[in-house]
A protein has these predicted regions:
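Acetyl-CoA-dependent GNAT
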Residues: 2-74, 85-87, 91, 95, ...
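Positions that flank functional sites
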Residues: 33, 107, 130
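Conserved glycine-rich acetyl-CoA-binding loop
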Residues: 50, 69-86, 93-95, 99, ...
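Beta-strand secondary-structure signal
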Residues: 60, 101, 138-140
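Conserved catalytic-core motifs of GNAT/GCN5-like acyltransferases
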Residues: 103, 116, 121-137
Length: 144
């Protein structure tokens, strides 16, 4: 398995993985538009050209938001998410980013534990943020 920068041939499998996770929160067109932005970066985990997962970042000069980090639901627990997050941390250090921020549903306990494992801490909450009424927890990791 390797982590590489997004290329356009990856968009269909990336969207397929995203669609299973987000209950329609992203449309194909929104994903395509985001990927065309200069400040959006996407890393893809692949095995023999099969997309296993991805991470989508939106950066500013000093920090970035992790918009999505998603692994194919049939392949979770195999270290793919860990490899993607390590790439995020490496990118942050290489580009001298001060911090990374993300949102996670308050009932997504596995994701919360995953983020905490990488040193993210909860800094806030957005009540009733998701369509289903769930709260979003805001997490942040400082690099500098």
């Amino acid at each position: 398995m390797k982590i590489s920068e997004f290329c356009w041939e990856d968009i269909a499998p990336v969207f397929a993985i995203l669609a299973t996770e987000n209950n329609g929160a992203w449309t194909y067109e929104q994903l395509e538009h985001s990927l065309k932005l200069e400040n959006v970066i996407c890393y893809v985990a692949k095995n023999d050209d099969k997309v296993l997962g991805f991470v989508l970042l939106e950066e500013t000069p000093y920090d970035f938001d992790i918009l999505e980090i998603v692994v194919d639901e049939n392949l979770r627990g195999r270290g793919i998410g860990t490899m993607l997050m390590k790439r995020v941390v490496d990118y942050a250090k290489l580009t001298h980013k001060e911090k990374a921020t993300l949102e996670v549903a308050s009932d997504n306990k596995n994701a919360i534990m995953f983020y905490e494992k990488f040193g993210f801490s909860q800094i806030g909450m957005r009540k009733n943020y998701y369509k289903n009424g769930n709260d979003a927890l805001v997490f942040q990791k400082t690099f500098i």
